[in-house]
């Protein structure tokens, strides 16, 4: 069983360190990173899908179309992870 880490993202295109997340996944196989795009208006979602291509079994993406705040994004990630358990 993997431990899920929920990472809410809003307009994080320039701040997402793709290499660091992929490296973390390679070194820590017992974790699932669940990125929640919270209605970003930049290319955050594209960056997340690019990351997922490099680690498809260790990264999940939840796309919330309308920005609703961090708490809502975290709840969406928790619901997603719960549905996968």
Regions found by a protein language model. Name each.
Residues 25-28, 53-58:
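Short helix-capping segments at alpha-helix termini
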Residues 38-39, 68, 77:
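Conserved short acidic donor-positioning loop in nucleotide-sugar-dependent glycosyltransferases
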Residues 37-46:
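A conserved acidic beta->alpha catalytic loop
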Residues 11-26:
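Short, well-formed alpha-helical segments that are part of the catalytic scaffolds
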Residues 3-12:
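A conserved hydrophobic helix/loop-capping motif in glycosyltransferases and polysaccharide synthases
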Residues 54, 72-85:
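Active-site nucleotide-sugar/metal-binding loop of Leloir-type enzymes
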Residues 63-70:
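Short, acidic/glycine-rich phosphate-metal binding loop used to engage nucleotide
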